Amino acid sequence: MPRVLIVGAGPVGQMAALLLSQHGIPSLLVDKRTTRLTAPKAHAVNARTLEICDSIGISASQLRELGAAANEGGMVRFVGTLTGPEFGSLPYERQDVGALESTPFPLSNIPQPLFEQVLARHVAEDPNIDYRLGTTCTSLINQGEQVAATLLDSRDESRSHSLLSDYAIAADGAGSSIRDSLDIEMEGPEALAHYLMIHFSADLRALTENRRGVLYFLFEPGVNGTLIAYDHSKTWVLMHPWQPGSEKLEDYTEARCAALIDKAVGQSLNGVTVENISPWTMTAQVAKAYRKGRIFLAGDSAHRIPPAGGLGLNSGIGDVQNLSWKLAAVLNGLAGERLLDTYEVERQPVARINNEQSLNNAIKLFDLIVALHGDDPEKTGERYAAISTSPNDFPELAEAVKAQKPHFDSFDLQIGYRYNSLAIVDPAPIPDVGDVSDYQPSWDAGAHFPHRWVTQDGETLSLHSLISPQTLTLLRGPRSSELSGHSRVKQLLFGVDFEDEDDWEMLTGLPTSGALLIRPDGHIATRFKTVNEEDFLSAIRQILARGD
């Protein structure tokens, strides 16, 4: 019997299995698909996700090599067409060397299929993971202290079987059938817009030689959508709006899609191959509950975040990092069942903030449309022609472009989110969302433990790499007392186990006798002004929801 059943083997489901395995927890990972994803879909793998990957032995540096270099995918461009006039540009996220002050691994543009392939290789090699493609979970119900599942062979529906597990994670996507079967409702708008994702192959390097970028927003009247450059030499997507109520998907033939691509590029192309055409609906919803009994929602099944901001996939990875160590602690007898209640308490607010920001990003793009087209439909062409000729004569255009910055730089949301729950002792208040690009490292309880470049045995490395992803870490001040008899807690002494160029008191705001207790997910669980057995054990009892 698997300890945990994971339904859905996308990046979130695979990451859940790998994280659980790191804690010694075996899982069964199933997916109804018989083949892996080929369409590019998501591409922004942010700093926090890369840090999590690195913590489980998936080299973040090697992952970043799969993505577009910053000089290829480091800009967002607002254009008429791909080859038409350009009205402004912005850096795409924090890919500059300055980001290394806050994270060892800046965001990288990695097509989702490539990211999934790397995860899949690690999953396939992990003896703790039973990985089954072509397996549909048709029923998942709470049954006392277990979860009962019915699994069906996707290739032969006459073959089905039942199994029991201690817990289950539903990572089965935005249209989660498990969420629906649990009667968990979603909050927020269900259908903001409808798009066709037209995935095509073409070598457009010659056309973008002087305007490399990852996103090209198209504003020429009659040209709608966004071009996404996953690889300028071969892999592109045109996001094209459509109306499913008045249009039929079958009307979008390859020939019609090729014509739309020509229009978006601004000239007729040769050597274009339309690979895939798939519809999708932009929503902005968060589940009212992340848990029902012993079944948990994670990733898109828990939140449908608009793609404007690249926060969806990364939020899902954050979900399972938060959940996995808690499940492992309970299953290994180290924590009480109540610890699992903190999953929703901590992750749901993060999803709501990310959802709201992504929705605001999408809405702000309309301000740019108005700046370019005006508010009189009959004069759209006239205004656009004037702006195309003399964009500097329209200062409101530059302001509208500048206002898009939060869309493409949400560094604080990506690595600066905080938690406030019973699994944090005396958490600092969570501040209101301000400038989402302005990340300020915090040493407060509940905050993500800050990255520092430190030296150990002559080697420069991130302090993150010394924090255990498998157990609690006690980072002690230079004059603090060592705690004996706690083999399950990793202890680090500031200035001895590693060297930092800055002062402990200046960094942490704690006396040299103090310490920080850091959870396996890298969040600060509590702060100690002095380290003593009584306070330490009291904190452990609260953090792990133990009644002893």
Q: What name fits each language-model region?
A:
Residues 2-29:
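N-terminal Rossmann-like FAD-binding beta1-loop-alpha1 element of flavoenzymes
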Residues 8-17, 119, 170, 274-360, ...:
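Conserved mid-domain beta->alpha element of the FAD-binding
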Residues 41, 46-118, 122:
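Active-site-adjacent segment of FAD-dependent monooxygenases/related oxidoreductases
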Residues 80-114, 155-159, 209, 219-276, ...:
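Conserved FAD/dinucleotide-binding core of flavoprotein oxidoreductases
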Residues 133-147:
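A conserved short coil-to-beta-strand element within the FAD-binding core of flavoproteins
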Residues 170-184:
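Flavin (primarily FAD) binding-site architecture
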Residues 328-448, 468, 472, 479:
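C-terminal helical "tail/cap" subdomain of flavin- and related membrane-associated enzymes
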